[in-house]
Amino acid sequence: MAKTIIEKIWESHTVVDESGKPNLLYVDLHMVHEVTSPQAFEGLRLAGRTVRRPDKTFATMDHNVPTVNRYDIRDQIARTQMETLAANCKQFGIEMVDLDHPENGIVHVIGPELGLTQPGHVIVCGDSHTSTHGAFGAIAFGIGTSEVEHVLATQTIWQSKPKTLEVHISGRLNEGISAKDVILAIIAKFGVDIGTGSIIEFTGEAIRGMTMEERMTICNMSIEAGAKAGLISPDQVTFDYLQGRANVPKGEAYDEIVEKWAQLATDPGATYDRSVTIDAAEIEPMVTWGTNPGQGAGISKAVPRLDDAKSEVERRAISQALDYMDIKPGTPLSEIEIQHVFIGSCTNSRLSDLRAAAAVINGRKVAPGVRALIVPGSQRVKKRAEEEGLDQVFKEAGFEWRDSGCSMCLSMNPDVVPEGERCASTSNRNFEGRQGKGARTHLVSPAMAAAAAIAGRFVDVRKMVKAGEC
């Protein structure tokens, strides 16, 4: 019987399967950070339990980390969370990359860098964007703190079996279209609830043509489409990325495991509970205008008018979003001015993202009145970027070059957008207050964010490149 990759991984990890009840799944990798783990470790202590598989548990500090002076942690709660993680990892024998470690960074960036993320795995973390790791052909999803404790104690997790959803991107992408544009276009077209109760498999020629870092961007925002997780069947691109990484088998063992990984791909003729298709050729550089990731459009479009709404519920949603964003209905996206630019986050802070931004920025200057930040996703990315001279490109243009961390993606560290000001951000969420109280967030790709920094407003980066302005 033909099966999807989702079914293959789920079935191979099911420990308990009772009719009408959630399945008990074995967990291959449990990633931990400082924000969602303190109560979980305390629960272990109170119950007199240990961590069942410390060798399959990995920790880092990322959410609260300052990106200017990493050790100047002025918020007492943030400091306590970081100190508590270090103490817990020491007590329970868990590997942790702290602020001094050369591999420190955002958990969803360093996991793949270190080869911890591998095809066929079930991966969990107390963070919603764990779906990033699905790019490798893994079922990866975020969990709550009580579930973190359960996984620490048992290396298993109870989960209801999800439905399967295929999102097929047909044809080839036009030049200048990024993975971020693709996932934003998918969410804008199908809505933020298209994936509810499902795990998405992304398929199609456009997906196969993407690098692993681009695939990570796609899967990262599966959660913004309402899905439990998102993944892509592994192929030679996946295997080439993983070969030689620290935690990946070497020599004959590598050849053997690649043979197993290759068997994970969805079988020809396998069926999904639902399939939807988007034409790659219709996707243009995207900009969100509202307060959820589905409220977005191509740069050539305008913010919707209230009369464009298909229902009274949608009309109210548009009105509320535009009131918060302080944008008039019908405003062309290319007329929206910005005061801040943030290039970073677990969505778009890898080396290829920084290269894309640098290609636009090179030889140009940040517009007057715009504050622009570049925050690498890991210290490894920062080091590589500096070796290539990308940091000089950014600094000469007027960007602030920072250390790694979650930074301005969320207002849990010193990097915030002031109230009432507008940010072009490569992160994944544009909810009210996400980047700071009263902050207004527009989600875009690294290239589009770079172009906005130069122009002081949203522009079609393809036209900027074609005109020789960068």
Curated annotation (Swiss-Prot):
Keyword set includes Iron: yes
CDD domains registered for this protein in UniProt: IPMI
Record's signal peptide: none
Lineage: Bacteria, Bacillati, Bacillota, Bacilli, Bacillales
Co-factor: note: Binds 1 [4Fe-4S] cluster per subunit.
Enzyme class, spelled out: lyase
Organism: Shouchella clausii (strain KSM-K16)
Record-listed [4Fe-4S] cluster binding positions: C346, C406, C409
Cofactors that this protein relies on: [4Fe-4S] cluster
Catalytic activity: (2R,3S)-3-isopropylmalate = (2S)-2-isopropylmalate
UniProt subunit comment: Heterodimer of LeuC and LeuD.
EC number annotated for this UniProt entry: 4.2.1.33
GO molecular function, one term: 4 iron, 4 sulfur cluster binding
GO BP terms, alphabetized: L-leucine biosynthetic process
Keyword Metal-binding: yes
Keywords carried by this UniProt record: 4Fe-4S, Amino-acid biosynthesis, Branched-chain amino acid biosynthesis, Iron, Iron-sulfur, Leucine biosynthesis, Lyase, Metal-binding
Name of encoding gene: leuC
Function: Catalyzes the isomerization between 2-isopropylmalate and 3-isopropylmalate, via the formation of 2-isopropylmaleate.
Family affiliation: Belongs to the aconitase/IPM isomerase family. LeuC type 1 subfamily.
Pathways per UniProt: Amino-acid biosynthesis; L-leucine biosynthesis; L-leucine from 3-methyl-2-oxobutanoate: step 2/4
Protein name in UniProt: 3-isopropylmalate dehydratase large subunit
